[in-house]
Amino acid sequence: MGLESTEAAVRWNNNLQALAENTGFGIPVNNSSDPRHSAGSTAEYMGVTGEPISKWANGIGLSASFDPELVKAFGEAGSAEYRALGITTALSPQIDLATEPRWMRFADTFGEHTQMTIDMTKAYCDGFQTTEGTADGWGKDSVNTMVKHFPGGGPCEGGRDAHYAYGKYAVYPGENFAEHLRPFTEGAFSLGGKTKKASAVMPYYTISYERDQKYGENVGNSFNKYLIQDLLREELGYDGVVCTDWGITHDTGKTEEEFAGKCWGVEHLTEAERHLKALEAGVDQFGGNNDVKPVMEAYGMACEKYGKEATDARSVSYTHLRAHETRRHL
């Protein structure tokens, strides 16, 4: 969404927060955004140069500086601008190892070099999340970062992207699955600043083919209990928010080229059943879903399956999301 002006953004955000305040739950609205700072050769012709925000290189351009301190400075500047606009979660950085040069999302990554990606990930997240002078690093200048895409979106088969059915698989012919995890384990989950780890993680659309070592499922990453619950939550100890990529519970298109839902591996399930499967896998939040009905239907199905008391006891999503909301001192 483009912004007419800083004033318009602030008015819109203030009105939205007032609406949330009047619900009685005391939960502020968390506005998130894909990267807004990238400058490109076509920006002037697309009418986005007037947006009230500074322009920087994209991921691969930031890496070309070979300077993590510069990237941290960008994060500090970017977070100040985001907070001024009412944005409190950055749907970035994209920390996939870009090992497939044909991939259309290559330019948004920090490149193919593992250690460079680790260093840039730390700098980016520390810059966006840290408020200086606070005990835990969180405060009025902090913006949550949502690192993407777990467990690494780079090894896309043939360079085809998983936004489309023809690119639904991530493959590991060289058995380098563990290498693609390093930007998460050594970067996003091991920050140098006081916030310690990226606040949120987004799994990619892909089916990480033959990577499920426990249940043997070839399903999209957000539906894969082994990857989210067993690996990310338990083995790696991640206790932040897990948010799905956009539209994974929606129906697919009629052709492989159609830009539609991305429920890879669970096309046979209903929309509500897909929500339930993702929740059972361990996700907290659904990206791009604007309808609460299938979520409530999934909750009802879970109550029937496990019992209401057990279902409520199993849910830790509220704890993750509440921390995500309040640590920024809204």
What do the predicted segments below correspond to?
Residues 1-322, 327-328:
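Glycoside hydrolase catalytic-domain context in secreted enzymes
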